[in-house]
Regions:
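Single-stranded RNA-binding regions, centering on S1/OB-family and related RNA-binding modules
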Residues: 560-562, 571-716
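Mobile "lid/hinge" segments at catalytic clefts and subdomain interfaces of large enzymes
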Residues: 151-267, 457-555
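Extended amphipathic alpha-helical scaffolds
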Residues: 2-56, 241-377, 562-576, 584, ...
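Flexible, glycine/charged-enriched surface loops at secondary-structure junctions
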Residues: 114-120, 155-157, 224-242, 273-274, ...
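Glycine-rich, flexible beta-strand/loop modules in the N-terminal catalytic cores of phosphate-handling
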Residues: 24, 36-121, 126-128, 133, ...
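Conserved phosphate/anionic-ligand binding catalytic regions in large, soluble enzymes, centered on
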Residues: 38-41, 133-151, 338-361, 442-462, ...
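Conserved helix-loop functional segments at active or binding sites
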Residues: 106-114, 149, 340, 365-368, ...
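Long, basic N-terminal domains or extensions that often function
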Residues: 2-243
């Protein structure tokens, strides 16, 4: 009996195409991952990303948040490589993968229903990588399309684009070569009407250029939104009904009516601890009054607190009043210090209200650069920024754990903000690491990290091109569309506000932006307003607080930092410096105590705790690669005598011949009549003959010396 085989058909297969920034974009549905709620294979150029979305059948019990997870998986087969790990498998997501997951999460999360509690998983797998076509953009588009055509409740779709700035011109989705010279890298995600996410790194770009880039991306995103809307109309599934999160509106209305005055009094303070203590005391009053009538009220307390506080904060802000009494354009009290820690290479303490960040800078040799094994073009990082957020910073008793996605994201934002002002390796041959320790948190810790890190780098003697400061902008909107923006948001304003628009930069321009939203997006008017008020604020922070603390980078690196010398040799002579089996360089390291790194282009970096060791190592290398200059005078030692002349060593292990006719002004019969082994003499380098031998002249050297002495010149 023969085996029966039936050819598999894909009756639900659909393909949609458009051109995006001059390259083909294809969305395929119905062929892969059919058991997911929806799956879209996005191919942009030769980049392919499979985007799958799934949702649980019922809500998760006992939670008051939306359980969304987003994973961006970097597969090394996408770039034709095998992982370098022991088992040759991809491990945990790298930093770039985590950051991309956050970039996908931030624009889609606010577009889910506020009372939706079903688990939702978004998984984007990079299966083919074309460095000219961003997998991040492909994943954003694919996620938007998958959610839009799925049966999962969601208020999309969105479109996504990157914008670069090359030779003063805005470029959509710049390719690999353009990105290398671009002064701007901004990712913009939009719905059909508003902007829902901005993530930017820039080389001190002015507000007008940044605004034009965002505006251009928002306009171009409408083409993607239109394509996905077409997909929804043709193959979209009806959205499923879900149990709405339980909420006791009757009890909440009673609490608001009876406790509004007490709640306002509790909120009206600039001290986070006082506010929380007052609120907890008021909750006890709720219990005393309502527990008998509503025995299940405890399950609603967190949501009651959130909604009640938001009601107060929103009303106050729309009236121009803030919980700590500040004006909308007023920054909390600031202070800045440097040299806080005695033995580190550089340190800066930046305090803004109850937010306090201690940043520490460390300098090391270039061998300490972080090596990267990812799908991206970047293979190493010379400047690294790490952000730590311990429990004690918010008064919580919890154990220390490895950095989470939030810590990695905040560290990357500060890193991106400062990278444009870090000196090039040719001017400052150090690997640089900054660690920002959040020791107290009441909002805007990432921006405090940027300010503190600028102080630490300047204290460490890193010659940054300009100081960088960061500030955040918040937003409250009324039901009629009117809005209020306010500067320097603290924790309670971040929690209950609708926007955290973080902008970092110098007085010249922007270096980084990160925008988080809790609403359905921003109009261009709000974005323009946020850019303007954050510029004014960061200039004040620089002029009034940071620059009076330390006006410019210290002229020298810390005495505890390694001393560095950079030199260049002919790449063909690298083997002479290294020696057979590394014998020569190992001897130099042993004699000098210095650490030596050699690049393939002949660049050599020498590092040591003291300058003397660096000088010893440099001299050893100089001696090895020494090439004399024709016509130059050298003071050398006679090492051998022959019948036809004397060999004079003009550098360690390097000698040349002074022919007998060149040993004296007059004729001599024997070499011994002019010199003996061990004598020191001046010689002039005459030539390298056809056999590579060095020819020297004592006679010509003395003639030149006498002429210089007669002219009053000093011989060195």
């Amino acid at each position: 009996m023969s085996t029966i085989i039936t050819k598999r058909q894909f009756p639900n297969y659909h393909k949609y195409t458009m051109e995006l920034a001059g390259r083909p974009l294809t969305l395929e549905v119905g062929k892969l991952a059919e058991l997911a709620n929806a799956a879209v294979m996005v191919t942009y150029g030769e980049t392919s990303v499979l985007c799958c979305v799934t949702a649980s059948a019922r809500p998760r019990d006992g939670i008051d948040f939306f359980p969304l997870s987003v994973d961006f998986e970097e597969k090394l087969y996408s770039v034709g490589r095998i992982p370098g790990s022991f088992n040759r498998r991809e491990g945990r997501p790298g930093e770039k993968g985590i950051l991309t997951s956050r970039v996908i999460d931030r624009p889609i999360r606010p577009l889910f229903p506020s009372d939706f509690r079903n688990d939702v998983s978004v998984m984007c797998t990079v299966m083919s990588m074309d460095h000219d076509c961003s997998p991040e953009i492909a994943a954003l588009i694919g996620t938007s399309a998958a959610l839009a055509i799925s049966d999962i409740p969601w208020n999309g779709p969105v479109g996504a684009l990157k914008v670069g700035l090359v030779d003063g011109e805005l470029v959509l989705n710049p390719n690999s070569e353009q990105r290398k010279v671009s002064d701007l890298d901004v990712t913009v995600v939009s719905t059909g009407k508003k902007v829902v996410m901005i993530e930017a790194g820039a080389n001190q770009v002015d507000n007008d250029t940044m605004y034009r880039a965002i505006q251009l991306a928002h306009q171009e995103n409408q083409k993607q939104v239109a394509l996905i809307n077409q997909m929804v109309s043709e193959i979209g599934k009806p959205k499923f009904d879900y149990p709405h999160a339980d909420f006791n509106q009757e009890l909440f209305d009673k609490i608001v009516h009876d406790f509004m005055d007490e709640a306002k009094a509790a909120m009206d303070t600039d001290d986070k601890n006082v506010r929380e203590a007052r609120w907890n005391e008021m909750i006890q009053h709720w219990h005393e009054k309502y527990l008998e009538e509503y025995p299940d009220m405890d399950q609603y307390l967190e949501e009651f607190t959130y909604k009640f506080q938001k009601k107060i904060v929103k009303a106050w802000l729309l009236e121009g009043h803030r919980v700590d009494g500040r004006q909308k354009n007023e920054i909390r009290p600031l202070s800045a210090e440097v040299g806080v820690l005695p033995r580190v290479h550089g340190s800066g303490l930046f305090t803004r209200g109850q937010t306090q960040v201690l940043s520490v800078a460390t300098l090391d040799t270039l061998s300490a650069c972080q090596k990267l094994d990812t799908i991206w073009e970047e293979t190493e990082k010379r400047y690294m920024h790490h952000y730590n957020f311990p429990g004690y910073s918010v008064g919580e008793a919890k154990p220390a754990r490895s950095p989470g996605r939030r810590e990695i994201g905040h560290g990357a934002l500060a890193e991106r903000a400062l990278l444009p002002v870090i000196p090039p390796v040719e001017e400052f041959p150090y690997a640089i690491r900054v660690v920002s320790e959040v020791v107290s948190s009441n909002g805007s810790t990432s921006q405090g990290s940027i300010c503190g890190s600028t102080l630490a780098l300047m204290d460490a003697g890193v010659p940054i091109s300009a100081p960088v400061a960061g500030i955040s902008c918040g937003l409250i909107q009324d039901d009629d569309g009117s809005f209020t923006t306010f500067i320097d948001i603290q924790g309670v304003e971040d929690f209950h506000g609708e926007m955290d628009f973080k902008v970092a930069g110098t007085k010249k321009g922007i270096t980084a932006i990160q925008m988080d939203l809790k609403n359905d997006g921003l109009t261009m008017e709000i974005i323009r307003n946020a850019l303007d008020i954050t510029y004014d604020a960061r200039c004040q922070i620089l002029d009034q607080i940071m620059l009076p603390c330390i006006a410019e980078p210290r002229p020298e690196v810390s005495k505890y930092a390694p001393k560095m010398i950079t030199m260049h040799i002919d790449p063909d002579r690298i083997r002479e410096v290294i020696g057979k089996g590394g014998s020569v360089i190992q001897k130099i390291v042993a004699e000098s105590g210095a650490k030596i790194d050699i690049d393939d282009d002949g660049t050599i970096h020498i590092a040591s705790p003291d300058a003397e060791s660096c000088a010893i190592a440099k001299k050893c290398i100089d001696d090895i690669v020494f090439v004399p200059e024709v016509g130059k005078l050298y003071y050398g030692r006679v090492v051998r005598l022959m019948t036809f002349g004397a060999f004079v060593e003009i550098a360690p292990g390097k000698d040349g011949l002074v022919h007998i006719s060149k040993l004296a002004d007059k004729r001599i019969e024997k070499v011994e009549d002019a010199c003996k082994v061990g004598d020191m003499m001046w010689v002039k380098f005459m030539e390298i003959d056809e056999k590579g031998r060095w020819n020297l002249s004592h006679k010509d050297a003395m003639k030149e010396i006498r002429a210089k002495e007669a002219a009053g010149e000093k011989i060195q």
